[in-house]
Amino acid sequence: MNPSSEGTDGLKQALSTARNNNASLHLLMLYPALPKELQVHQKAFEAFLSERIEASLKNVQEALGGEVVEPTREVMMSDSSPAVVITRYVLRHGYDLLVKEAEDTGGEGGFKALDMSLLRKFPSALYLARPISHSREKIRVAVAVDPITESEDAYDLNIRLLQNARSIADSCSGVLDIVSCWEYPYEEYLRHTPWLKISDEELADAVVNIWSEHRAALDALIADAGIAGENRVHHLRGEARELLGKFVRNEKVDIMVMGTVARTGITGFVIGNTAENVFEKLDCSLLALKPAGYVSPIKAYE
């Protein structure tokens, strides 16, 4: 929780997630170190922040209704980079998921520096919450995957993306939108190069073959994930960096599930490249996963 934020969307979605998964929940509010001349008031300031947590928690629990998980609470001073403090805290305590309210971008898409730092370096599942206007039964959930993988880790990550997204959809509208982008990157080059004589028919056949291979791999991946329920597949032609943000806006997606890591073998999902470009255009909540075995550059103890 951010002491300077009045929003409770992250808290509401964290409580809802914990309830839906019968999980425990710990609330952590970080605040920056006070100036030297104000440090005498640190205890009083922490008491004030604790009161804010209790008030926000009560309001959200009442809004959710029914049985709600009773979380543990903690107020802690951040004496260094918030991304480092958060990551170390999660590593030391072994939490599976971090739910954080996305920093306010003033109505623009994308994520601010702290959230991007967590997307790059945080090792566990990360959920960046934004306001959701739909009622729970109408919440739109989408997942982005690339079935053409070059490693077992990348394949396993795709399976986890599908299964996690399906679980979220089951607790919302029941419908999961599965998005995958394909393209034939040499098409324009082959069409216009004077050095190769390729007929339009040959080129069209090559494009169809690429589409067919990609779609077959996508269908096989979805089958391997073993996800039941209503799954709507969107097999989009073009670059993921251009199409995913448009898809989210046009389809009014509330929650996007994606993979992000330095290198996984997942074409187009390289943080600092395609994935980062996609993140810059997202205006919805985001669940970001990394492959098993990913090691963060931030260590639990240093």
Predicted regions and their residues:
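General small-molecule cofactor/ligand-binding pocket signal
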Residues: 26-28, 72-76, 127, 177-179, ...
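Flexible internal linker/loop segments at domain or repeat junctions
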Residues: 186-214, 218, 226-227
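A short acidic, glycine-rich active-site loop
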Residues: 44-55, 150, 200-213
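Gly/Ser-rich helix-loop-strand patches that form or flank binding pockets
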Residues: 87-137, 246-299
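Structural beta-alpha unit
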Residues: 44, 62-98, 222-256, 264, ...
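Hydrophobic alpha-helical membrane-association signature
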Residues: 10, 53-56, 157, 161, ...
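Small/aliphatic-rich secondary-structure junction motif
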Residues: 1-44, 142-200, 223, 281
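Aromatic/hydrophobic pocket-lining residues that form π-stacking "cages" and hydrophobic walls in ligand
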Residues: 14, 86, 165, 244, ...
